[in-house]
Amino acid sequence: MNSKDISSKKLTLQGFSKLKLDFNLSSSASPSMGATIVKKRRRKTHDTEEQDENKLLGSLTKKEQISRINAVQNAALLKERNLKEKEAIVKKDSIVKEDSNEKTNDRDSATNTSFKETGKEVLNDVSLVELIENNTDNEDNNKKSLKTNKDIYSKHSKRIIAQSIDDKIEQPSVFKQRFGIRNRKSEFTKGKNISREVIIPDEITIKELSIRMAEDSKSVLKMLKEEMGENYGVDGLVDPEVACEIVEKFNHTAKRVSGANKEKNLFFIEERESLPKKPKPPIVTFMGHVDHGKTSLLDAFRESNVAERELGGITQHIGAYQIITKDKKITFIDTPGHEAFTAMRACGANITNIVVIVVAADDGVMKQTIEAMNHAKAANVSIIVAINKIDRSQSGDVERIISSLPQYDLIPEELGGDVIVVPVSAKKKINLDKLEEAILLIAELMKLEAIEDCRALGWVIESKIDKAKGISATLIVEEGTLKVGDMLVVGTAYGKVRSMVNHLGQREKVALPSSPIEITGLNGIPNAGDKFVVVSSEKQAREIAEYRLELIKEKKEDLSNNNLDMFSRNDSEVEELSVVLKCDVTGSIEAISNSIDKLGKDQVKLNILHKAVGGITDSDVLLAEASSAVILAFNVKVDSKIRDLAKRKGVEIHTYSIIYELIDDMRMYLTKMLKPVTREVRIGSASVRQIFNVSRVGNIIGCYVSDGVVKKDSLIKVMRNNKLIYEGKLKALRRFKDNVKEVGTNFECGVSLDGNVDIKVGDILEAHQLVQEERVL
């Protein structure tokens, strides 16, 4: 019986009996088809099953009986069709296997098509059941067809349909492709491993190592635990040697790169020989003793008045300027002449091409003049001597200075050497043109050239913190072209160039060789004299800066360990003055630090707890309070709020604008902290003339004071034939019968000494006194 016969006829009780008989016969003849469903559910014999069915059907209404029979019949038909389709699928699969050239995609497509057709047939069978139920309702009630209560049979029907679908879909790959589900992880892990070259730095975490190998961090941790017996966290640092072993176990190649390799060739310009070079302006540095007119001479070239604005009449920063003269550019660097700025002068000598040693005609060669000469000679740069202030010098001063230069290994042209000497006057602008010609002549002879088409490198002149700009640094480009947006590393600081301003305050986008430029964008404050270089990425800049910072940290730890024993031995004896130092620029910090460090002695020392560029902050005051320190502010303004806070906390703040005033005050502070020195001073002497034995008192020594004075609290030394036979204190000092405090020269006195002393006539008594003297640094 097919589905069309069932759907076209109404089923009566007589029809049901006949259908039941046919169904039982088919079930006994073919157990695998529909009968197994009933047996599986009830698990009874054929006779018992038939009785139970009659009983069950008798308890149901006519409508329910017909619906139950129709459902069972359709389930049997569905099972039979599914079996046939399953056999067809198996046959197709065998054909596909025999044909090795046929693509698997064709097979999947055919299977998917079969799956869709089967789904349609299942839906048709469900519709067939609903149609029979509707026909039965029309026969009994002659009303509109009513839908069957699906809640009674939905669970049973769903189980039959789901079982039929499961029988048809036995291949998981077909089901997964039908619904788009794939085991992506298994497919990924089965892929072919790629061998990589893994860079191993001095320090690396498990997470970073896993990323570089393109491996799962869990696999790395598991391997470490199982094969090496090590327990690590994902963010834990691993030894470089262990990291190399891990890389090799994952079939990769390890390349060990130490921090030193990061610095290697950092300042090397690739293809230097092939890149074109262009002439660059000379960098000229004015050096010399304090107040010899270096800044005034530079002002005469620049036609400005910087010297008049400088506090104390001395330069305390390195200044960089660029002027145009005779259609040629010259970059000038002005360095401080005070002895505290030795590091700045050394920095200026290393950066420059030409050094102009400025000597005042009335003072001649001084201490810092000699130091500047030594810096210039050590840097192997050309030297010009400018004898300034000739407008107020006396006759013969210039000749005297010229004749003294050879003793400093500077042979002037007047004496057959190659050092140009130019007498000038910055105030009267005398011979400035001759000095300018000398500079341009030497620059032309030196043939100064630089590559412009390469990454920039150069030097830091000075750095500071500005409230509006943040951290800024003044640079001199040595080679290459510096641009806004370049990533550079300088000392332990790095960052992207955010802005560039020239010495006139004008914004620039590029800076060529020998150009002084002020930049912003660094994450830290570099030191004057640090060398900068443009790098390819922020990662490279950060790694180099961190490596340098680590080196500095290691050096400090070594120094601390070496001095630990010394400090522990002397800690109880050494007085310490702690200070917090805040300055306007890094150059001032270095100069002041070096100067006040030299003030310390064995019994007193100055400890700089913290030094930084910028204004005084709340944390500075709190640090000073906790450490009983003094705050020194150099060229830094102090807010009223900070002063109030310091007053409440009992912290002293001393502000300075001239460096030697700060140094003098620190010397005075340390001097007051020094313990006075106790010295033994001879104050007089007396000769023994007679010895009296007094009962109940002892020996009384009769003396004559030959010089000085003998005091009652004097320390007495008894000398016999220039040998010390006794040292002690006076027990009593009398003149006649009266006790006196002292006896002067040419007077007689009687003394008694502590202890038993063998005194003879002719012995000499020397009177000494302990005197405390203030120490001076």
Curated annotation (Swiss-Prot):
Region (G4): 388-391
InterPro entries: EF-G-like_DII (IPR053905), IF2_II (IPR044145), P-loop_NTPase (IPR027417), Small_GTP-bd (IPR005225), T_Tr_GTP-bd_dom (IPR000795), TF_IF2_bacterial-like (IPR000178), TIF_IF2 (IPR015760), TIF_IF2_dom3 (IPR023115)
CDD domains for the chain: IF2_eIF5B, IF2_mtIF2_II, mtIF2_IVc
Protein task: One of the essential components for the initiation of protein synthesis. Protects formylmethionyl-tRNA from spontaneous hydrolysis and promotes its binding to the 30S ribosomal subunits. Also involved in the hydrolysis of GTP during the formation of the 70S ribosomal complex.
Main location class: cytoplasm
Protein's name in the database: Translation initiation factor IF-2
An MF annotation (GO) of this entry: translation initiation factor activity
Domain of life: Bacteria
GO cellular component terms, semicolon-separated: cytoplasm
Binding of GTP, residues: 288-295, 334-338, 388-391
Organism for this UniProt entry: Wolbachia sp. subsp. Brugia malayi (strain TRS)
Subcellular location: Cytoplasm
Membership in a protein family: Belongs to the TRAFAC class translation factor GTPase superfamily. Classic translation factor GTPase family. IF-2 subfamily.
Span of domain tr-type G: 279-449
HAMAP family in UniProt: IF_2_B
Keyword annotations of the record: Cytoplasm, GTP-binding, Initiation factor, Nucleotide-binding, Protein biosynthesis
Basic and acidic residues bias (residue ranges): 98-109
Transmembrane segments: none
Region (G5): 425-427
Start and end residues of each stretch annotated as Disordered: 30-54, 98-117
Pfam families (UniProt xref): EF-G_D2, GTP_EFTU, IF-2
